[in-house]
């Protein structure tokens, strides 16, 4: 009779454990909550210099336009019967660049201009800018997701060269009267 080493037994147990866990019953309260998901591409351009004036500048763009699942926004974990309400995105941008003015671009006509928001919760070292979606949401039965009828696109120019830009993006969506939020942060570097 051959004996197995302890190592091969432990190795086999490690592979078997996930299969056992995968079949465990998950209680109903553990189901995922609705969320405003998607990809907003934040782009910090390389510094450029105006040939006439010699002034340096950097362009910062927030681009949510594109096709699912690579770009855009969508509400997940909400049934076809859900009511999707107030939706907004607040972009906290490092105060080292001063207060910015954004231009709306692309087909973001259902989004309010991304503008300074004095009512947003204060984040030390950041200035808040908020846009609100004023369009309608359409349910896609194939993906079981809700999609807005337009996607955000904003751009601004900073009148100097920037090599890093700390940002925090906070997303908020109301589903059946409850507000759900999601936040992501990072430091942008020129593309």
Give the positions of each predicted feature.
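A surface/secretory-pathway sequence property marking extracellular, secreted
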Residues: 87-133
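Low-complexity, intrinsically disordered segments enriched in Ser/Thr together with acidic residues
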Residues: 125-164
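Short, solvent-exposed loop/turn segments enriched in Ser/Thr/Gly
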Residues: 53-72
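Buried hydrophobic-core signal for structured, non-transmembrane domains
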Residues: 71-76, 168-170
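N-terminal secretory signal peptides and thylakoid transit peptides that target proteins
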Residues: 1-17
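Short beta-strand elements
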Residues: 168, 175-191
């Amino acid at each position: 009779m051959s004996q197995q080493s302890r190592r091969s037994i432990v190795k086999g147990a490690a592979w078997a454990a996930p299969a056992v866990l995968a079949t465990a019953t998950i209680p109903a309260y553990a189901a995922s909550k609705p969320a405003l998901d998607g990809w907003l591409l934040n782009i910090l351009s390389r510094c450029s210099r105006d040939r006439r004036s010699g002034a340096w500048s950097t362009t910062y763009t927030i681009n949510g336009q594109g096709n699912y699942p690579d770009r855009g926004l969508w509400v997940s974990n909400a049934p076809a019967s859900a009511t999707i309400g107030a939706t907004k995105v607040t972009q906290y941008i490092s105060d080292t660049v001063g207060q910015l003015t954004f231009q709306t671009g692309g087909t973001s006509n259902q989004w309010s201009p991304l503008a300074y928001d004095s009512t947003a919760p204060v984040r030390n070292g950041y200035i808040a800018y908020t846009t609100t979606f004023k369009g309608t949401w359409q349910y896609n039965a194939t993906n079981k997701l809700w999609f807005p009828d337009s996607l955000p696109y904003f751009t601004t120019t900073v009148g100097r060269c920037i090599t890093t830009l700390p940002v925090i993006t906070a997303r908020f969506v109301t589903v059946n009267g409850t507000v759900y939020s999601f936040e992501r942060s990072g430091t942008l570097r020129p593309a």
